[in-house]
């Protein structure tokens, strides 16, 4: 009797296909309980994606937790003997906080782990199975590969202090070239060192194009060993028709990954559906001398494959369309003028239409006209491929996007302002009025000052005048509004300008179109600057 799986949801079909794939590869199913001792997560919290865990006291008095992670439990219980390689796959739910809903989410995962003796053969098998997993999901896919050993080797060669490494890797991960250079300078690197880090941004593309440049940039044995492993992986997967891409800015968490790292994307989905890498450091906490590599497939992301298609789809005769989230207002007008001047204009009069979607299929461009504060949301969730947004909005939203270019447009700064006669009283918390709650919290936490936040949505300057707050945190451009209301700038702590951002998944499939637009936009901005 044959069972028709076509009636199942995409994630249900995927689970059948992946189970067959993993069992054929010699993996045994690992099943764990829903609860785990909280102490396991408390002692290993640096290996978790978030320290927030759902806990409860069991009937016998033990403090238990709903599992936020599967790999940690497998690493604890596997206990491979010397020379042995254990191969497990799993299909479990984990419970993690959502930055969007500010609640805990139940997340369906399916994945595999190879533990114990992990050499070149096991690494190649794990990455090959990751690629095969993506191929089972029924959409065009990309597997993005990098190596933490290569990144650590470069940081070693440049003499980067341990305390500065996490910040540099975060800027690399976001492809934020402008702030990477600033962070490199803050870490004590000279111009040559900063350029060496910036050069990683260029090590991105098809394996056969990028690997020679990866090898040429090696400075020590650690980098050469990583490059050799990447070469072996490329040879193993050479039949993937360009679906394997190297990207040396892909950096996993320092405390977790120590070797190969990779992420998988499906066309039309806004986030990675697969994440994995080598995590010997975690494994060796439980079994000294052992290694481990594995990955997880995020099945819940596949629910989007059964969602209705948006009304603006590519026609068969069209160029690949770049969907641009453009902020309404002065900034959007400036940006559109620049883009129209370099070949990305639309036949319709941008300023006259009341349409929210304007496009030019011949130029491969489509604009969504949105509220400035919503640009990052449209891009992060994949409704738009790229967008232009102020650094203030981007920071406040903590959007998980690539920050590809500082346009230099709309320059201003984030400031603390107060009445002219204001004196700070360290004996009590500062009352802060702002619409930038997260930015204000982060700034005052960095200087160790307690605050009470008063969230307002407009006319922020009125708050200290009426005694509602002691100070405000707000954007200042010329300072005229502050002066006319008897306020002064106390501290400037964040420069702001408009940034060109991209959805991480869209970048994998439309990077040529994005790079072409970026190159033209940089040239237009440079020409504009020269005219000043």
Briefly describe each language-model feature range.
Residues 7-25, 36-37, 69-82, 89-139, ...:
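Positively charged, Gly/Ser-enriched RNA/tRNA-binding surfaces
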Residues 12-33, 329-348:
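Intrinsically disordered, low-complexity, positively charged segments
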Residues 34-64, 414:
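Polyanion/phosphate-binding surface patch
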Residues 52-102, 375, 380-389:
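Glycine-rich, N-terminal phosphate-binding loop and its surrounding beta-alpha-beta segment
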Residues 60-62, 114-120, 506:
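A generic structural motif
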Residues 106-110, 146-153:
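Short, conserved phosphate-binding/catalytic loop or strand-edge motifs used
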Residues 151-242, 477, 486-488, 510-531:
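Long, charged alpha-helical interface segments
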Residues 317-532:
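Domain-level signature for soluble enzymes in the chorismate/prephenate branch of the shikimate pathway
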């Amino acid at each position: 009797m044959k069972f028709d799986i076509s009636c199942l949801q995409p994630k249900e079909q995927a689970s059948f296909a992946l189970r067959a794939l993993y069992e054929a590869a010699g993996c045994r199913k690992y099943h764990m309980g829903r609860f785990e001792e909280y102490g396991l997560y408390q002692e290993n919290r640096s290996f978790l994606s978030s320290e927030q865990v759902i806990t409860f006291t069991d009937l016998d008095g033990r403090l238990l937790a709903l599992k936020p992670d599967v790999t940690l439990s497998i690493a604890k219980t596997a206990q491979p003997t010397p020379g042995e390689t254990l191969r497990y796959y799993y299909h479990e739910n984990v419970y993690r906080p959502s930055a969007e809903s500010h609640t805990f989410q139940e997340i369906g995962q399916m994945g595999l782990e190879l533990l114990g003796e992990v050499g070149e053969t096991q690494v190649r098998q794990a990455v090959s199975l990751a690629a095969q997993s993506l191929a089972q999901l029924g959409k065009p896919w990309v597997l993005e590969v990098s190596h933490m050993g290569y990144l650590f080797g470069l940081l070693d060669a440049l003499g980067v202090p341990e305390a500065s490494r996490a910040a540099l890797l975060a800027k690399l991960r976001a492809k934020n070239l402008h702030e990477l250079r600033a962070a490199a300078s803050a870490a004590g690197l000279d111009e040559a060192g900063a350029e060496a880090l910036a050069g990683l941004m260029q090590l991105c593309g098809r394996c056969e194009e990028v690997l020679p440049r990866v090898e040429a940039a090696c400075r020590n044995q650690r980098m050469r060993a990583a490059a050799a492993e990447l070469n072996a992986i490329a040879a193993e997967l050479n039949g993937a028709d360009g679906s394997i891409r190297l990207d040396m800015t892909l950096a996993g968490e320092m405390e977790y990954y120590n070797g190969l790292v990779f992420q998988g994307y499906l066309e039309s989905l806004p986030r990675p559906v697969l994440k994995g890498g080598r995590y010997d450091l975690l494994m060796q906490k439980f079994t000294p001398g052992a290694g481990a590599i594995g990955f997880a497939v995020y099945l819940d992301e596949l629910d989007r494959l059964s969602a209705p298609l948006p009304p603006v789809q590519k026609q068969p005769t069209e160029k690949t369309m770049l969907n641009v989230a453009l902020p309404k207002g002065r900034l959007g007008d400036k940006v559109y003028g620049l883009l129209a001047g370099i070949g990305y204009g639309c036949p319709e009069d941008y300023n006259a239409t009341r349409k929210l979607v304007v496009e030019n299929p011949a130029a491969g461009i489509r604009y969504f006209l949105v509220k400035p504060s919503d640009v990052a949301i449209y891009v992060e969730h994949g409704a738009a491929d790229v967008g232009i947004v102020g650094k203030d909005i981007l920071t406040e939203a903590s959007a998980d996007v690539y920050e590809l270019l500082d346009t230099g447009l709309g320059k201003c700064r984030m400031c603390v302002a107060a009445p002219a006669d204001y004196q700070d009283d360290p004996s009590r918390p500062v009352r802060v009025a702002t619409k930038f709650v997260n930015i204000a919290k982060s700034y005052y936490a960095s200087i160790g000052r307690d605050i009470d936040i008063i969230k307002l949505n407009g006319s922020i300057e009125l708050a200290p005048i009426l005694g509602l707050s002691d100070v405000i945190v707000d954007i200042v451009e010329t300072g005229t509004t502050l002066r006319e209301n008897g306020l002064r700038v106390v501290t400037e702590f964040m420069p702001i300008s408009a940034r060109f951002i991209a959805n991480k998944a869209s970048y994998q499939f439309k990077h040529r179109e994005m790079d072409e637009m970026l190159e033209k936009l940089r040239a237009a901005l440079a020409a504009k600057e020269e005219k000043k």
